[in-house]
C-alpha cells in the first residue's frame, strides 16, 4: 500500500492554510468540532502545540504537503497514567477517502512511539458515525457513555468514550 499522507507539527506559516480549511469545512465540522476561525485563535492553537501537555499534528498529503486534516493529543499526562485525549478533523474536500484513517494511524504511532503514551482516549458524539467508524477501524474499544460531557457550540453534548492502549495497538 502506498503512503498517501504524512504528519508534521504546525508552524506559524501554516496559519492561513489552516484558516482556509476551517472556513471551507465549517458546516461539515458542525456540531462536532469548532476549530479556530480567526488569525489570533489560529496562532494561539499553534502556540499551544508547543506546550508540554498538548501535541498538535497536521495530516498532509504526501504529493503536495497540503493540509488535509488535524490530529491533536490534549491533556497529556505522564508518570503512572501516560494518557492523552485524541481529537481530529478533516478538510471537507478530502472526507471519505480514507486519508484521515491513515493520518490518525500515523498520529497514534507517534503518540505511542515518540510521546511514549500508554493509552489514548477519544470522546465522540454518538451522532458522529464517521468518527466512531474511524476509531473502530483503528481498534479502539468503546468504554462507556458520558452524559453532557463537553460544551460544544454552546451546548453540553453527550459523548461515547473509546480508548486504545499500546498493547492493543501492535
Regions found by a protein language model. Give the residues of each.
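Acyl-donor (CoA/ACP) binding surface of acyl/acetyltransferases
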Residues: 1-17, 21-26, 60-170
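Conserved GNAT-fold acetyl-CoA-binding loop/helix
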Residues: 27-46
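A generic secondary-structure signal
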Residues: 45-48, 110
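A short helix-loop-beta-strand connector motif used in the catalytic cores of GNAT acetyltransferases and
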Residues: 47-58
Amino acid at each position: 500500500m502506498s503512503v498517501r499522507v504524512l504528519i508534521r507539527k504546525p508552524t506559524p506559516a501554516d496559519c492561513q492554510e489552516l484558516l482556509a480549511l476551517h472556513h471551507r469545512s465549517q458546516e461539515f465540522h458542525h456540531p462536532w468540532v469548532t476549530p479556530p476561525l480567526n488569525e489570533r485563535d489560529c496562532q494561539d492553537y499553534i502556540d499551544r502545540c508547543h506546550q508540554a501537555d498538548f501535541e498538535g499534528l497536521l495530516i498532509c498529503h504526501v504529493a503536495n504537503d497540503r493540509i488535509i486534516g488535524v490530529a491533536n493529543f490534549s491533556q497529556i499526562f505522564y508518570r503512572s497514567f501516560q494518557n492523552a485525549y485524541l481529537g481530529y478533523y478533516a478538510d471537507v474536500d478530502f472526507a471519505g477517502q480514507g486519508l484521515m484513517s491513515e493520518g490518525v494511524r500515523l498520529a497514534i504511532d507517534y503518540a505511542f512511539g515518540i510521546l511514549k503514551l500508554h493509552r489514548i482516549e477519544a470522546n465522540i458524539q454518538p451522532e458522529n458515525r464517521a468518527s466512531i467508524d474511524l476509531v473502530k477501524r483503528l481498534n479502539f474499544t468503546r468504554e462507556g457513555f458520558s452524559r453532557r460531557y463537553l460544551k460544544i457550540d454552546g451546548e453540553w453534548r453527550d459523548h461515547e468514550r473509546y480508548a486504545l492502549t499500546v498493547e492493543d495497538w501492535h
